[in-house]
Amino acid sequence: MSTLEEHIDVGVPIDTVWDSLHRMEDYPRFVEGVREVRTEAGGRARLEVEADGRVRELEAEVSDRRGEGVMEWHTTGAPELMGSVSLKPIDENRTRVQARLEYDPGAIREALGGPKGFAQANAIERLVRSDLEHFKECVEQGR
């Protein structure tokens, strides 16, 4: 498994970021390739994802550790992905958002397409960074 960690500082209080993070139906606004998210009972979500010209549905289980400011998730089928988003208050009006993603490069390429090797790692890093920047914009603008 490969691991990627990225963070961004957002200019809103931690509770606002936490609430935005849990409005999964808004993910298509800031997560590239996510076309639709449907939340289900029991902490499950179905994501319709478009990658490399193909549309695919992924199912994920999501769990919270609100007291610690952590939301964790993992896919329940292929490709095997897992990650977390941790929130840390910088002060009363700013929050650090730390994203962690663990993935199998071969499984990602097989399921979603895209480049191999370092090119794949760089593409995923750019994608996560871009998604965090879009999340920041959405949260700070109250969208």
Regions found by a protein language model. Name each.
Residues 1-9, 47, 123, 129, ...:
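Hydrophobic-ligand-binding modules of eukaryotic lipid transfer/binding families
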Residues 1-44, 134-137:
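Hydrophobic ligand-binding cavity/cleft-lining segments
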Residues 40, 63-65, 86-90:
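Short beta-strand micro-motifs enriched in acidic
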Residues 47-49, 89:
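Flexible glycine-/small-residue-rich
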Residues 58-66, 71-77, 83:
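Helix-adjacent hinge/juxtasegments
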Residues 74-130, 137:
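Beta-strand/loop substructures that line and gate deep hydrophobic ligand-binding cavities in soluble
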